[in-house]
From Swiss-Prot:
Coiled coil: none annotated. Monomer or homodimer. GO terms for molecular function: alpha-amylase inhibitor activity. Inhibits alpha-amylases but not trypsin. Is more effective against insect alpha-amylases than those of mammals. The keyword Chaperone does not apply. May exist both in a glycosylated and in an unglycosylated form. It is found in: Secreted. It comes from the Eukaryota. This is Alpha-amylase inhibitor. One of its GO terms (cellular component) is extracellular region. Belongs to the protease inhibitor I6 (cereal trypsin/alpha-amylase inhibitor) family.
Length: 25
């Protein structure tokens, strides 16, 4: 989530390495 894009990120970001963006705003 630290490397995540804002909550506007799409599930694609998960594949990019953003695993827990779903659990964070």
């Amino acid at each position: 989530s630290e490397d995540c894009t804002p909550w506007t990120a799409t599930p694609i970001t998960v594949l990019a390495g953003c695993r827990d963006y779903v659990g964070e705003q």
